C-alpha cells in the first residue's frame, strides 16, 4: 500500500524524518518496502504576477504580457484567453524543464521577444485543465518555487500490509500506528452533514435478500451535484497513493476509501429503476457489464447490487457501466456497506477481478465504520460539487456483525512472556493509543478488561494484546537475557530421527524437498479416480477457505506432488525429483474428530542420467523408482521388504505398480501414475511416485545402528534359471530363499528375466543369483552345493518351478 507522508500529517503531528518513520513503522510490524520522494515533473517554475497586457501586433490570438517575479520584470508572449492584469500565474523561466521533455528557451514569437512561458495545469502535469493558464491564489509570494508553495513535493512509503492488519489499509490506520508509536494524539477529521433536501425515504429504498452476505447496507441521496474536476489538493492526495483523478464525485469515494479504509460506490440515481436497491445473489449464467466495459458471466454465488429491475454493481468489487457517474449526472445515491469477506473473496476469484475495494472487503473492514464513511463522503461531495444532501439515511442491518468481546489482560503474564518489566500503566496507555477501551479489573492488581475496537478484526485473545504491547513498546527495548535453570538432555524422538534420516538420504540421492499446502481442491479425489468406498474420499472441509481450490484438507500427498509437477512443466522444467514429508487428514466413519497421519511421498519424472557420456538419453522408469525405495530401506536398516502387485491404487498404472510391505504390514505403494490421471492434469510425461506411512515405518525403525564384523573369507555364487508361471512374483521366490534361514546364504537377487523362444507359452525364465559366505572358513564346493540344493528344492516345492 502506498502512503503519503503529507496526508499522514493531516491526522498526526510527525516530527520524524522519512527514514525514521520508515524504521519505526517497520519495527512496529508494518514493513516499509520502499521510501520514495515524489514531486512535480517540472523545475524552475516560479510564481509571477501579470502587470501589463496588450494584443500582439502581428497575431490576433496572441497577447504580450509583462510579468513580475518581485525581482525582475519579463516580457512573455502568451496565447491563453483567460489571463488578466493582476492574475498570479506559474512562470516557466529560461532553462525550465516541463513534462514532455521540453526546455524553455528565450525566443521570438512573431517578432516579439518572449523570456519564458505561462503554463496551464496540463502543461505542468498537475491537472487536466487545458483551457488556459493556471490561475494561482493571489496571496502566493512572488518569485517562490511553485512546487514549494503548492506543497507538490511529498514522500511516499510502500508498506507491505499483512492480511491480518486490514485496519492499516487506510491513511488513518497508519496514522493511528504512528500516533501510538510516538505518543502523539490522533486527529480525526470532523464529520458534519448539512441536510437540505427532501427525505431520502421519499425517493429510495433498500432491500437485503441475503443478510448472511450483506448484514449492513447504508445509503444517502445527494441532489443537484455538478460533476467536474476535483480541487488540486484532492488530486494531489490521490495521485500520491497511486490513484487517478476521475471527477469530484468519484474522487471523493476513492479519497474516503483511502482515508478511512471503507470502500464506497456512487450510483447515478436516474438509472436506478424504481429508485430501489436490492441486494441479492446472482443467477447462474447471468450477464453483467462492469465499469471497465467488460461483460461478466456470473455464477449463482456472486452477491449483486440491483435496482428494481437489473443488477447495477458487483457487491464490494466493481460498479456497473449502466449506472456510472457521468458528466451530466445530477442526483446520486451513495452506498456504504459491510459485505462478508468470504463472499467477496470467492466472487473476486471466480470473476478474476482484483480491485482496491475487493482487497479491503475480503480482509475485513470496520463494521462500525460504515456510517462514518458514508457521512464523510456525503460531506465532501456536497462541498466539492454543490450538491444538497437529502434528510436522513437508509440504514438496513438485518443481521449484527459479530465483534470481539472483552479480553482479560494480566500484566504480570505479559512481562513473564516478554521478559520485561513494563509498568501496568504503560501497557494501558499503549492499548488506549491503539484505540482500545481499557478498564481496571475490580479487586485485582495489574489486571485489565480490554475491549478491542471494531476495526481490529485480528485481536481476539490475550496473546494478541501481548503482541500489541511488545511491538509498540519496541522489540529493541526488550532486554536480552539468557534462560536460567537446570537443563536435562531430552531423549530424541524416534520419529524425528526417522524423518531426518529420510530427508538426508533422499536429498543425497538428488531429490529436492517441497512443502505444499495442506488445503487442496475438492476435485482431487476425482482427478485421482479414487474408488467410491475409499476412505480418502471422506474429506475434512474448511469453513472459510481462501479459494475453492483450497477448500478441503488433503487425504494423500500424491495430488500435491502432481500439482508441483504440473506447475514445473508449465514453466518448462520436465526433469524433476521431489519429495515431501507431511500430514494427511482423514475424516473416518465415526463422525468424530479427523485423524492426522504422517506420510512420505516422492515423485520422479523426466530423463535419467541424460548427461552420461557412455549412453544415450533414457527416461526414468519403474525400476529407477524401485531402486530409490530399496536404497531408502537399506539406509534405515529395514529388512523383510516385499512387493505385492495385488495391492493396487486407482491412480497408478495397473501393470507398473505394486504395494510395499514389511513382513505382513502394508506401509505404502509405488508405481507409475495412471495415464488418465496425467491427462486430467494436462500432462504427458511419465510420473513415477510412491507414498509411505511414516507412522508405520517408525514402529519398525529402531533409530540405532548395529555393527557386526565382516567376513574375511571369499564368497561363492551360484546362478540358477527357473521356469515358472507368468503370474508368479519374483519377490515371493526371493523370500522363500531368504526364509530358509540357511546360515551360509548371504544374499539372493535377480539377474535375468526372460520370456520368448525356448520358454513355453505362459511361462517365464527367472534367473536368480545365490551368494554364500562363511565367517569361519573358506567354503568348499561340497558345503555350498549341499546348502544350495536344499534352497533350490524348497523353491521348486513351493512354486512349482523347474530348473531350466
Swiss-Prot record:
Pfam family, one: B5
Cofactor entry: Mg(2+)
Domain B5: from-to ranges: 402-480
GO biological process: phenylalanyl-tRNA aminoacylation
Cellular localisation: Cytoplasm
Alphabetized SUPFAM superfamilies for the sequence: Anticodon-binding domain of PheRS, Class II aaRS and biotin synthetases, Nucleic acid-binding proteins, PheT/TilS domain, Putative DNA-binding domain
EC number: 6.1.1.20
Alphabetical UniProt keywords: Aminoacyl-tRNA synthetase, ATP-binding, Cytoplasm, Ligase, Magnesium, Metal-binding, Nucleotide-binding, Protein biosynthesis, RNA-binding, tRNA-binding
Family classification: Belongs to the phenylalanyl-tRNA synthetase beta subunit family. Type 1 subfamily.
Record PANTHER family: PHENYLALANINE--TRNA LIGASE BETA SUBUNIT, PHENYLALANYL-TRNA SYNTHETASE BETA CHAIN AND LEUCINE-RICH REPEAT-CONTAINING PROTEIN 47
Name by which UniProt lists this protein: Phenylalanine--tRNA ligase beta subunit
Upper classification of the organism: Bacteria, Pseudomonadati, Thermodesulfobacteriota, Syntrophia, Syntrophales
Gene: pheT
Amino acid at each position: 500500500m502506498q502512503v503519503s507522508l503529507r496526508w499522514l500529517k493531516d491526522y498526526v503531528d510527525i516530527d520524524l524524518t522519512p527514514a525514521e518513520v520508515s524504521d519505526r513503522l517497520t519495527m512496529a510490524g508494518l514493513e516499509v518496502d520502499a521510501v520514495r520522494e515524489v514531486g512535480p515533473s517540472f523545475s524552475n517554475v516560479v510564481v509571477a504576477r501579470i502587470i501589463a497586457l496588450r494584443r500582439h501586433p502581428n497575431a490576433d490570438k496572441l497577447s504580450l504580457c509583462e510579468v513580475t517575479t518581485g525581482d525582475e520584470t519579463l516580457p512573455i508572449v502568451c496565447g491563453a484567453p483567460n489571463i488578466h492584469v493582476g492574475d498570479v500565474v506559474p512562470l516557466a523561466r529560461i532553462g525550465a524543464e516541463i513534462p514532455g521533455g521540453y526546455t524553455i528557451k528565450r525566443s521570438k514569437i512573431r517578432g516579439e521577444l518572449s523570456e519564458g512561458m505561462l503554463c496551464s495545469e496540463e502543461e505542468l502535469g498537475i491537472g487536466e485543465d487545458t483551457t488556459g493558464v493556471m490561475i494561482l491564489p493571489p496571496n502566493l509570494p512572488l518569485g517562490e518555487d511553485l512546487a514549494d508553495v503548492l506543497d507538490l513535493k511529498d514522500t511516499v512509503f510502500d508498506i507491505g500490509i499483512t492480511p491480518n492488519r486490514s485496519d492499516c489499509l487506510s491513511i488513518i490506520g497508519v496514522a493511528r500506528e504512528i500516533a501510538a508509536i510516538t505518543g502523539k494524539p490522533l486527529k480525526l477529521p470532523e464529520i458534519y452533514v448539512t441536510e437540505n433536501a427532501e427525505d431520502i425515504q421519499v425517493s429510495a429504498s433498500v432491500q437485503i435478500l441475503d443478510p448472511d452476505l450483506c448484514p449492513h447496507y447504508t445509503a444517502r441521496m445527494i441532489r443537484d451535484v455538478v460533476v467536474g474536476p476535483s480541487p488540486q489538493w484532492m488530486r494531489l492526495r490521490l495521485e500520491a497513493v497511486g490513484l487517478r483523478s476521475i471527477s469530484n464525485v468519484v474522487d471523493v469515494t476513492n479519497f474516503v476509501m483511502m482515508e478511512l479504509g471503507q470502500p464506497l460506490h456512487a450510483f447515478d440515481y436516474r438509472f436506478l429503476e424504481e429508485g430501489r436497491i436490492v441486494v441479492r445473489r446472482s443467477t447462474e449464467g447471468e450477464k453483467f457489464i462492469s465499469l471497465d466495459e467488460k461483460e461478466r458471466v456470473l455464477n449463482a454465488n456472486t452477491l449483486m447490487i440491483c435496482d428494481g429491475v437489473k443488477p447495477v454493481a458487483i457487491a464490494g468489487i466493481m460498479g456497473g457501466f449502466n449506472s456510472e457517474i457521468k458528466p451530466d449526472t445530477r442526483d446520486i445515491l451513495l452506498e456504504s456497506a459491510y459485505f462478508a469477506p468470504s463472499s467477496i473473496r470467492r466472487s473476486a476469484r471466480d470473476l478474476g477481478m482484483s480491485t482496491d475495494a475487493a482487497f479491503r472487503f475480503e480482509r475485513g473492514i470496520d463494521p462500525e465504520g460504515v456510517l462514518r464513511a458514508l457521512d464523510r463522503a456525503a460531506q465532501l461531495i456536497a462541498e466539492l460539487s454543490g450538491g444538497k444532501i437529502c434528510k436522513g439515511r437508509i440504514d438496513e442491518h438485518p443481521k449484527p456483525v459479530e465483534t470481539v468481546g472483552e479480553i482479560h489482560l494480566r500484566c504480570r503474564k505479559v512481562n513473564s512472556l516478554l521478559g520485561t518489566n513494563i509498568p501496568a500503566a504503560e501497557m494501558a496507555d499503549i492499548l488506549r493509543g491503539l484505540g482500545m477501551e481499557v478498564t481496571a479489573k475490580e479487586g485485582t492488581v495489574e489486571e485489565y478488561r480490554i475491549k478491542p475496537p471494531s476495526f481490529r478484526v485480528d485481536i481476539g485473545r490475550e496473546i494478541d494484546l501481548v503482541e500489541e504491547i511488545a511491538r509498540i513498546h519496541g522489540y529493541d527495548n526488550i532486554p536480552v537475557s539468557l534462560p536460567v535453570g537446570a537443563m536435562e538432555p531430552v531423549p530424541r524422538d524416534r520419529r524425528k530421527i526417522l524423518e531426518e534420516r529420510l530427508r538426508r538420504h533422499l536429498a543425497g540421492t538428488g531429490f529436492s524437498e517441497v512443502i505444499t499446502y495442506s488445503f487442496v481442491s475438492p476435485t482431487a479425489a476425482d482427478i485421482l479416480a479414487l474408488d467410491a468406498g475409499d476412505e480418502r474420499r471422506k474429506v475434512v472441509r474448511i469453513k472459510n477457505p481462501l479459494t475453492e481450490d483450497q477448500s478441503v484438507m488433503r487425504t494423500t500427498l500424491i495430488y500435491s506432488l502432481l500439482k508441483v509437477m504440473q506447475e514445473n512443466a508449465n514453466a518448462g522444467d520436465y526433469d524433476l525429483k521431489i519429495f515431501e514429508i507431511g500430514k494427511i487428514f482423514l475424516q473416518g466413519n465415526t463422525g468424530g474428530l479427523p485423524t492426522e497421519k504422517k506420510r512420505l511421498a516422492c515423485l520422479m519424472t523426466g530423463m535419467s542420467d541424460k548427461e552420461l557420456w557412455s549412453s544415450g538419453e533414457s527416461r526414468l522408469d519403474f525400476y529407477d523408482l524401485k531402486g530409490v525405495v530399496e536404497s531408502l530401506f537399506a539406509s534405515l536398516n529395514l529388512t523383510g521388504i516385499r512387493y505385492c502387485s495385488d495391492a493396487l491404487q486407482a491412480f497408478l498404472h495397473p501393470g507398473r505398480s505394486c504395494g510395499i510391505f514389511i513382513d505382513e504390514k502394508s506401509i505404502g505403494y509405488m508405481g507409475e501414475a495412471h495415464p488418465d490421471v496425467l491427462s486430467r492434469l494436462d500432462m504427458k510425461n511419465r510420473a513415477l511416485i510412491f507414498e509411505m506411512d511414516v507412522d508405520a515405518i517408525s514402529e519398525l525403525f529402531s533409530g540405532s545402528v548395529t555393527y557386526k564384523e565382516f567376513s574375511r573369507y571369499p564368497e561363492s555364487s551360484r546362478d540358477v534359471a527357473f521356469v515358472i508361471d507368468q503370474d508368479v512374483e519374483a519377490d515371493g521366490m526371493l523370500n522363500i530363499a531368504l526364509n530358509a534361514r540357511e546360515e551360509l546364504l548371504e544374499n539372493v537377487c535377480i539377474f535375468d528375466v526372460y520370456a520368448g523362444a525356448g520358454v513355453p507359452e505362459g511361462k517365464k525364465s527367472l534367473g536368480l543369483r545365490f551368494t554364500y559366505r562363511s565367517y569361519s572358513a573358506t567354503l568348499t564346493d561340497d558345503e555350498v552345493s549341499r546348502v544350495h540344493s536344499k534352497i533350490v528344492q524348497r523353491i521348486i516345492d513351493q512354486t512349482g518351478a523347474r530348473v531350466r
